[in-house]
């Protein structure tokens, strides 16, 4: 186990990519703060923080199921304080919680715009700000944003979402410079292809021939967190490219449909009209 007795906080960890990342960190030896809004089962939207926590405990690690809406500053501070009171440190923060809304500017309701901004960029900022004092005190930490390289051509059809996600990347780059001397890293990671999740299913983003499993994001995350923080920081990474550089050659194992290699779309995927 690469991260024995480290502590990780993963937002949006009740399902999908966030859950996969939380479980992978547990498998690598971490105790995990499972932070998300969902506490009760919902037939339309599977997964709760308690279900993820139980699966982590089944792996032999400790879990803290923490109900968290990242838009609530007091709740963010409370969850971080509870984790520190229980385990004394937070070594890894994964800013995965997200609001997904893809519409042209003319069709974007301002309430939706505010939601996307408050969850994605403001929520990531709040969580990052809250964990930094502990990471600096311990002279160790990795912060990971699930956000893409900034591309001014990538926002068509999803401008509000693009602004919020690019904002997360800019947070990572700024924080990297601010805390490098304290052996704390901040990086951004984005998938080369669509990833199977409730988001891709509910928003009709093609079918399983176009998707990879969340495992590829988890493998890239583990590789990033294994780096020396003060050395490997301020990076904007694509999962496949990072893993290839690290020596991975078998990407077929990440396919959702074993007979189809998903195309690389990066941040440029567009929903079909209608």
Go through each PLM region and give its residues.
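A short helix-coil junction within the Rossmann-fold of NAD(P)-dependent oxidoreductases
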Residues: 28, 86-87, 103-104, 130-142, ...
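Active-site loop of short-chain dehydrogenase/reductase
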Residues: 6, 61-62, 89-90, 135-149, ...
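Catalytic loop of short-chain dehydrogenase/reductase
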Residues: 142-181, 190-195
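A short, exposed helix-loop element centered on a Lys and neighboring polar residues
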Residues: 128-129, 173
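Substrate-binding pocket helix/loop in short-chain dehydrogenase/reductase
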Residues: 104-105, 112-114
